[in-house]
């Protein structure tokens, strides 16, 4: 292992946000994992109402079961979900306690989000579904063609979460500082930029993770020569 340079890191922890950078990652298997390890990013221990981690699989590795709903997005490699193959950019949503087997066909990495499902009276819980990010038509954010959003979860009140990818052309930014009741888990997939979190401004790049608590002032602007892109979770469709 290479020794760290005098304890310096871009990573930071505040009461209402976390920037976790790859140099700070600690890997450990979670219960039920076989041939796989996890980098836990957000969890109830930090105050989050969901858990998000990166799962790193050897060929044949599997995830354990969970009583929560689960969203899996393939970052690299190939995952088999009950025999169906998901490649990079593919994803699956699983209802609570779903028995589906998630297995790596080759060495793979995936973003995993787990959250207790909050039901709505009279509306049944959705069934498992799969998708591919590139098959979705992007939508400009507030009519800005330089910021494109793909919604990976259907617009259906049965779902209590939203997961999107957002792509920013170099120099593009969010049009406002957002302050809202939803919390976020965000994985930087590509590029770099500046993220405002509260009264702190952080350089961020591909591989970073950000947790944002409710009502945290937040803003992002893309820098560099290529588009910046991230995967972002929020709680949705339920009373606070």
Q: Model features per residue range: what roles?
A:
Residues 78, 99, 109, 185, ...:
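Structural motif
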Residues 53-55, 163-166, 176-177, 184, ...:
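A structural feature that tracks compact, well-ordered secondary-structure segments
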Residues 82-99, 198-214:
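Short acidic-glycine-tyrosine-enriched beta hairpin
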Residues 106-122, 160, 165, 211, ...:
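A short hydrophobic beta-strand segment most commonly corresponding to one strand
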Residues 1-49, 107-160:
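A short, N-terminal "cap"/entry segment at the start of jelly-roll beta-barrel domains
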Residues 35-40, 49-67, 151-152, 164-180, ...:
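Conserved short histidine dyad/triad with adjacent acidic residue
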Residues 67-82, 181-198:
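Glycine- and acidic-residue-biased ligand/ion/polar-headgroup-sensing regions
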Residues 102-106, 220-223:
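Asparagine-centered strand-capping/turn motif at beta-strand->loop junctions
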């Amino acid at each position: 292992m290479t020794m760290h340079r005098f304890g310096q890191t871009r990573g930071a922890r505040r009461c209402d946000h976390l920037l976790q950078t790859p140099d700070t990652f600690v890997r450990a298997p979670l219960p039920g994992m076989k041939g796989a390890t996890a980098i836990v990013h957000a969890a109830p221990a930090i105050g989050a109402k969901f858990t998000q981690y990166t799962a790193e699989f050897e060929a044949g590795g599997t995830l354990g079961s969970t009583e929560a709903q689960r969203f899996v997005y393939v970052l690299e490699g190939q995952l088999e979900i009950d025999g169906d193959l998901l490649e990079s950019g593919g994803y699956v949503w699983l209802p609570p306690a779903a028995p589906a087997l998630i297995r790596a066909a080759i060495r793979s990495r995936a973003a995993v989000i787990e959250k207790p499902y909050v039901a709505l009276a009279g509306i049944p819980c959705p069934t498992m579904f799969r998708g591919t990010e590139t098959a979705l038509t992007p939508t400009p954010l507030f009519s800005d063609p330089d910021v494109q959003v793909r919604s990976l979860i259907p617009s259906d009140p049965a779902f209590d979460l939203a997961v999107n990818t957002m792509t920013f052309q170099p120099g593009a930014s969010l049009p406002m500082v957002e302050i809202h009741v939803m919390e976020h888990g965000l994985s930087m997939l590509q590029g770099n930029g500046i993220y405002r979190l509260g009264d702190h401004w952080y350089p961020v790049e591909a591989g970073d993770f950000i947790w944002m608590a409710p009502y945290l002032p937040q803003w992002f602007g893309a820098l560099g020569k290529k588009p910046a892109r991230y995967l972002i979770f929020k709680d949705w469709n339920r009373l606070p």
